[in-house]
């Protein structure tokens, strides 16, 4: 199993190096992260595998999407940074005001759980509680990555059609 994962890891690294477009680079990097995490999981190194997968997918979401959108935008428009910062601040304040009472009541009414003081039980409990959140986070990041790539690719095609039709 490890030999097959190492071979596929090498193949994914070659795919990243030889990517002909940012889309294939993003896909190859996603496979590289997944295979590296599986190789670490096969060696019973659980926490770095989880962190590796989340960092790779989150980093790809930021770097590849930004570079693809920047390369695909034929006529970049300036962004009103002041309005964006004000709207973001307003959204954070609104979410904080709405969620504060619910978090406070949840923490006050929920009985505290008693843990065994053995470290193995505590680590098992942390992993058991966090595994579903990790799976949800990976699915959301992957869906977001490919949906934004799809939107950017259609935008590029639309912009090319618009520019060629005006001449």
From Swiss-Prot:
Keyword Translocase annotated: yes
EC number of the protein: 7.1.1.2
Major location category of this protein: mitochondrion
GO-annotated cellular components: mitochondrial membrane; mitochondrion
Keyword field: Electron transport, Membrane, Mitochondrion, NAD, Respiratory chain, Translocase, Transmembrane, Transmembrane helix, Transport, Ubiquinone
One annotated GO molecular function: NADH dehydrogenase (ubiquinone) activity
Stretches of the chain forming a coiled coil according to its record: none
Enzyme class: translocase
Record's bilayer topology term: Multi-pass membrane protein
Disulphide bridges: none
Record-annotated membrane-spanning stretches: 21-41, 45-65, 78-98, 132-152
Catalytic reaction equation(s): a ubiquinone + NADH + 5 H(+)(in) = a ubiquinol + NAD(+) + 4 H(+)(out)
Cell compartment(s), UniProt: Mitochondrion membrane
InterPro entries reported for this sequence: ComplexI_Subunit6
Function: Core subunit of the mitochondrial membrane respiratory chain NADH dehydrogenase (Complex I) that is believed to belong to the minimal assembly required for catalysis. Complex I functions in the transfer of electrons from NADH to the respiratory chain. The immediate electron acceptor for the enzyme is believed to be ubiquinone.
Entry similarity comment: Belongs to the complex I subunit 6 family.
Name this polypeptide is given: NADH-ubiquinone oxidoreductase chain 6
Gene name in the database record: ND6
